[in-house]
Amino acid sequence: MGSEKDSESPRSTSLHAAAPDPKCRSGGRRRRLTLHSVFSASARGRRARAKPQAEPPPPAAQPPPAPAPAAAQGPPPEALPAEPAAEAEAEAAAAAAEPGFDDEEAAEGGGPGAEEVECPLCLVRLPPERAPRLLSCPHRSCRDCLRHYLRLEISESRVPISCPECSERLNPHDIRLLLADPPLMHKYEEFMLRRYLASDPDCRWCPAPDCGYAVIAYGCASCPKLTCEREGCQTEFCYHCKQIWHPNQTCDMARQQRAQTLRVRTKHTSGLSYGQESGPADDIKPCPRCSAYIIKMNDGSCNHMTCAVCGCEFCWLCMKEISDLHYLSPSGCTFWGKKPWSRKKKILWQLGTLIGAPVGISLIAGIAIPAMVIGIPVYVGRKIHSRYEGRKTSKHKRNLAITGGVTLSVIASPVIAAVSVGIGVPIMLAYVYGVVPISLCRGGGCGVSTANGKGVKIEFDEDDGPITVADAWRALKNPSIGESSIEGLTSVLSTSGSPTDGLSVMQGPYSETASFAALSGGTLSGGILSSGKGKYSRLEVQADVQKEIFPKDTASLGAISDNASTRAMAGSIISSYNPQDRECNNMEIQVDIEAKPSHYQLVSGSSTEDSLHVHAQMAENEEEGSGGGGSEEDPPCRHQSCEQKDCLASKPWDISLAQPESIRSDLESSDAQSDDVPDITSDECGSPRSHTAACPSTPRAQGAPSPSAHMNLSALAEGQTVLKPEGGEARV
């Protein structure tokens, strides 16, 4: 008994504590990891780091201390782990202060046994230290994939850069740490600045090719002259057209002048050309805000475009900035497709909407009212049931909540339906009968116009599409033939003064040429073919005109067999279309005429002197014919309205075309076979009109048909034009 009491006494307890068992761990409960212990350990670590700095270190030769009592030999239980915890905390703080994502343990806060992370880009499971955290979103990817992604986005000017997994924009600080490339980062910042400036409507970029300076000009519309303030540039440009300053000219005039200059440079530069082999240029259009060129496949895909430079959202069909309701409005633009609706389709859609709107709105209201009255209570009951389903609540409480919610929704649903229909129906009617007609007529889509005060006129003609880069290239590619050139050639090939004038125009087999077929009795009116004694003045002309580039006009004259052939320059035909390019036009014409009257000439004007000269030639030919008539009998006349001696068809005649004085020397040198044909100068050789035949006609021959003279004019692929007769051929 006494020994048991002594062992249980406090004195015996102190003796046992003074000699602890080395196999037992003291303070095991205090090593348990809890949230409080983590924060308390960090506080103890900070105190432990501050304590050695305050106390001086003990001397090295200090004698060992005297033996203390057993109760004071052991250190406190919490003093042993405090030193390692302080060292770990100091290392973590130093690692967190280092720039970059090189030490992921500091950012992760875990050891090497942390869970691996799967990269969403390369689908490879990696340790957490290779998947840095981002400031903008919680998504993580491997460092190599992020660097490659950032380089690709910056090189293609897709800024600002978003997260690969979501639409959150990456922080520039993260981009700088991931790239570690100052030149690429400078390019990123420049693209960001350009995108911001492009969204400013008053920002104007200097048009100088070696300048990237921008001028923000607020309120400069009235004084459009701007000056680049960059040192060494000082370029003056226009605020409106954003091009080089054009004094004493409007923007349209300056634009036309630049187009002509570009056209001339294109003709004389072999490297600048466009053809079908260069690609479909119809797919290139400028952004309506920043004018950056955008290419899109013409496959009928989505027409909602977003500019990568300024972020402008526009429609590819109408090239206008749009909103979310653009494709639901009566603009004629469709979300998919290659072209907008035609004017006829838009008008029919408008009429159908105006007529069918009351029926459609009534059906919508009739369906919406019962759907809301029945659907709202059902929806409320299901939501309340799903909310109480996962909770541990009594069944009576849940049923009471569901019943109360459904009852209130049954009472409120008719009111909600009535308010919705009462507000929605007037809005729909106002949209159909107000917004739709006004928007269509304001944009010219309805085709309603006033016909000179005679009433309202509805036009169903198709609208012209927007002018694209391809249209400009086509204009530069084929500047010689067009609608205006056809009109000019029509006025050139036909002359007035004959009741049988006529001209028909048809498209040739080549896209770069235009074929003109003319059937006219007055084309050479006033000439020998419609003279007083000649009843034949029918002339068929078929010409192919092609633009050629030569340094100067050339022509030659020759004769083959009995027919007279003329090689002449007809650049004036094309000059009537484009007088500025007269020196670069060349057209070779070969003429053969079936009837062969002698010493008759086709002159290029209808002046009185030329007419008198032709009369003198006719008189000389008649005298020669009367003097030598005994030797050879003239063929009988086929006309009933003329006499045998006066009929021109019964006598041989020679015809020559008068040439300009500028090429008379060439003609005289090549006229060895046509010495009997006299030369005649033309006063109108430099005019843009074509050379027509002119000679006086007698009253008896006016308006007579001319079936015996045929002239066919055909064009070679190389640009030469050959005129072939039915009876022979002459080369020009």
Swiss-Prot record:
Residues 54-79 have a biased composition (Pro residues). Residues 1-112, 618-732 are annotated as: Disordered. It catalyses: [E2 ubiquitin-conjugating enzyme]-S-ubiquitinyl-L-cysteine + [acceptor protein]-L-lysine = [E2 ubiquitin-conjugating enzyme]-L-cysteine + [acceptor protein]-N(6)-ubiquitinyl-L-lysine. Zn(2+) 2 binds at residues 206, 211, 228, 233. Zn(2+) 1 binds at residues 119, 122, 142, 145. A zinc finger (IBR-type) spans 186-251. A zinc finger (RING-type) spans 119-168, 287-318. Residues 673-682 have a biased composition (Acidic residues). Its EC number is 2.3.2.31. Residues 635-648 have a biased composition (Basic and acidic residues). Residues 1-318 are annotated as: Required for ubiquitin ligase activity and for protection against staurosporin-induced cell death. Expressed specifically in natural killer cells, activated macrophages and cytotoxic T-cells. Present in natural killer cells (at protein level). Ubiquitously expressed with high expression in testis. The keyword Endoplasmic reticulum applies. Induction: In natural killer cells, by IFNB1/IFN-beta and IL2/interleukin-2 (at protein level). Up-regulated by endoplasmic reticulum (ER) stress triggered by thapsigargin or tunicamycin. It is a multi-pass membrane protein. Zn(2+) 4 binds at residues 287, 290, 307, 310. It comes from the Eukaryota. SMART domains: IBR, RING. One of its GO terms (molecular function) is zinc ion binding. The active site is at residue 302. Zn(2+) 3 binds at residues 238, 241, 246, 251. Residues 115-337 are annotated as: TRIAD supradomain. Interacts with UBE2L3, UBE2L6 and UCKL1. The first IBR-type zinc finger is the most crucial for interaction with UBE2L3, UBE2L6 and UCKL1. Members of the RBR family are atypical E3 ligases. They interact with the E2 conjugating enzyme UBE2L3 and function like HECT-type E3 enzymes: they bind E2s via the first RING domain, but require an obligate trans-thiolation step during the ubiquitin transfer, requiring a conserved cysteine residue in the second RING domain. Belongs to the RBR family. RNF19 subfamily. This is E3 ubiquitin-protein ligase RNF19B. It comes from Homo sapiens (Human). The lineage of its organism: Eukaryota, Metazoa, Chordata, Craniata, Vertebrata. The gene is RNF19B.
